[in-house]
Amino acid sequence: MKDLGERRESGSVYELSAEKRVVSVKFGKRLSVRDVEGYVTALMADPSFIPDFSEIVDLSNVEELDLSSEHAITLADMVDPFCSRAKRAFVAQSRVQIHAARLHQILRNDERNIRIFASLAEAQEWLKE
């Protein structure tokens, strides 16, 4: 696991399994554009990363979302390192978390390959399908 956060409240921790072709990322209590950009920058620099890997985005710790609509559009359109056929599973439980995941799903215009789950186990199971 690569810890990309300076504090527990923000940042992210990601793990890449080239064997399983899955990237898992867990964000802290506060999610900002800087946190997402830091994760993407580290992922793009990782020589094991391939854009068609699957991804699990665990938002279960996020309590505060500090992303404007303009930031969300930029992240979805220009910063997102995954290709359109990659399966993406968001773990979200609260209204704030579900809103963040749903916003990305809408902006990427992909309800087939981007799904939202209440638990990590459900997300992992879907990626195995």
Q: Where on the chain are the PLM-derived regions?
A:
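Amphipathic, Lys/Arg-enriched alpha-helical "gate/interface" segment within cytosolic domains
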Residues: 2-129
